[in-house]
Curated annotation (Swiss-Prot):
Other remarks in the entry: The a and c carboxylates of cobyrinate are activated for nucleophilic attack via formation of a phosphorylated intermediate by ATP. CbiA catalyzes first the amidation of the c-carboxylate, and then that of the a-carboxylate.
Official protein name in the record: Cobyrinate a,c-diamide synthase
Listed pathway(s): Cofactor biosynthesis; adenosylcobalamin biosynthesis; cob(II)yrinate a,c-diamide from sirohydrochlorin (anaerobic route): step 10/10
PROSITE patterns, sorted: GATASE_COBBQ
The species this protein was found in: Synechocystis sp. (strain ATCC 27184 / PCC 6803 / Kazusa)
Active site: 331
A single BP term in Gene Ontology: cobalamin biosynthetic process
Matches recorded under HAMAP family: CobB_CbiA
Recorded catalytic activity of this chain's protein: cob(II)yrinate + 2 L-glutamine + 2 ATP + 2 H2O = cob(II)yrinate a,c diamide + 2 L-glutamate + 2 ADP + 2 phosphate + 2 H(+)
Cofactors (names): Mg(2+)
Pfam families: CbiA, GATase_3
Function in brief: Catalyzes the ATP-dependent amidation of the two carboxylate groups at positions a and c of cobyrinate, using either L-glutamine or ammonia as the nitrogen source.
Annotated site residue numbers, Increases nucleophilicity of active site Cys: 433
Gene3D superfamilies reported in the protein's UniProt record: 3.40.50.880, P-loop containing nucleotide triphosphate hydrolases
Amino acid sequence: MTVIIAGERSGAGKTTITLAMLAYLARQKLRVQSFKVGPDYIDPMFHSQITGRPCRNLDPFLTSEAYVQRCFHYHSQGTPYSLIEGVMGLFDGVPYQGLTDYSSTAHIARLLNLPIVFVMDCQRLSGSVAAIVQGYRHWQPGVNLVGVILNRVGGDRHLELLKIALEPLRIPILGVFFRQQDLTLPDRHLGLVPCGELPQIQQYFDQLAHVAAQQLDWPKLLPLLETPRNLPSPMSLFDVPQKSPQARLAIAQDQAFNFYYADNLDLLTHCGFELIPFSPLEDTELPPAIDGVYLGGGFPELFAEQLSQNQALKDQLKTLIHQGLPTYGECGGLMYLSQSLTNFEGQIFPMLEMLPTAVTMGGKLSLGYRQAQVVNSHSWLWQTESLRGHEFHRSQMTKLPNQALYRQRGLLAIDQNTTDGWCVGSVQASYLHLHWGSQISTVEKFRAACLAFQKKLSYLGKHPPFKSVPLRNTGGDAHGRE
């Protein structure tokens, strides 16, 4: 059937309980495909660490409703179990296309016709829990709550009061997590600390699996997680033909740069890129014969000193950029491309110095969906092309571009038009995070720029000819689909 794990608000315990369920299934050697509603990067890292499979984001604003359906159907194929973690509170979305809850957990439930297991934070509640559950249960037609999991229960007496309150609703209680069980993950300025920075993460997953085995009603819950057998079976996730490898793309992947959507990586491969990971933290040289660089988001502010001191890699990358190497940076990538990065402690570290601005940490959180229009005629993208993305950062540029890459605004009437992004030579960088699932032309234009650079250096005798490798199926398979 597949269920969505939802909650009444952020912090109710959706992530902890989702991870506990995934950890239990993994310890039972049961294959499961996980999904995450919304644009988040960090929660999917934890999912993937447990399951050994890339978690897939389901976000109709960043992509489209049709893409969300195709993504779920495509990636669920071949796995006996599927599980979706929701976002924020059940009905928390944005006003868009006539809906007030667009991209919410409830929106995804309606799109995919899936039931919901509702996580209820029971701290400082007893009888009132029934009113909350009943309200969420009947607030919106088409949203089907098939059970609740009670979280942060104080003890046996508290649990008895909760059961008495919920009994008239006749809604199954599928699990109970007690407050005494310390299952909290550390967090910081942009959410959870990524699992790659937590040395004891496997012990934590073992603890979650143990608690899940004891506290969840698996005879009732496991059938709800079975992947539906009557789903459509799309042959490909993407609606463009697959291309054989044509260009080498160096992609920054380490503790400083790790915000990448799995579908984006699959799409790059599908569109003819050979992806070559490198570490701006550890590597002293770039991969050989590259045709482009992708610097994703992450936490460069936490590794600014180490990034700054890796002068050999910085010098090589700067030389190639001056030669015209197409370079794309998102958020953390923009920060790395700037003149300098001032961390939260006020320390200043020189960066790549490819953009005429510096970046300073601090200030208010910039957060939310953005509708953007390309306004820079020197971009690889078509001028006036419209894109949808999101911002999530706590840093500011010291100088804004005179001719920005994007003109953009949020989705509320109170939101103002703003500009964002740089287009300097062969560099494009902005704070905007993009999911390319429904914006494939962006990848195709980036590929065209990389192929033009490849041709230029080959003509000058500075670039060996590209050696094609056998075509492999993508749209998921290249990055973990079995």
